Amino acid sequence: DGLIPYIQTIGLYRSKAKNVLETCRLILEHHGGEVPRDRDALQALPGVGRKTANVVLNTAFGEPTIAVDTHVFRVGNRTGLGKGKTPLAVELALLKNIPDEFKVDAHHWLILHGRYTCQARKPRCYDCVLADLCDFRHKTPPPGEASATPALRRKPKATGAV
């Protein structure tokens, strides 16, 4: 209960609080109080999947991992750097295509690029440093220009009146 006030603004905070406390207990009991540096050991902790394990390995230990969140998934697929239908497929494609010297930082660059430039609804292709490499740029015109594809037209709502 002591942890909940600090995390109650995030979704599923009760189960996350339970997982955090259990994870701390397991790290103390099974890992001598040290966060494991192994993906399998991390994923054995409650609430830790591949994405979270990759974040820990990358940020805490400087490992060349790519945690595929919604932004990385979108940027990877739009640019062709990491095409795939699943986060794992995108991760593996990105690891194959990104030069070794950039792998540690690429995860953060891709997240920021997806958050601020290659946005889901209104991508800023006209302002993108990767536009010349990206197939998606033709789908998003600069502000003020007509859309490359016609906007969907909404059907009027039925009122029930005859």
Across the structure, where does each feature detected by a protein language model lie?
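Long, low-complexity, intrinsically disordered segments
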Residues: 154-162
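Catalytic cores of DNA base-excision repair glycosylases
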Residues: 1-148, 152-155
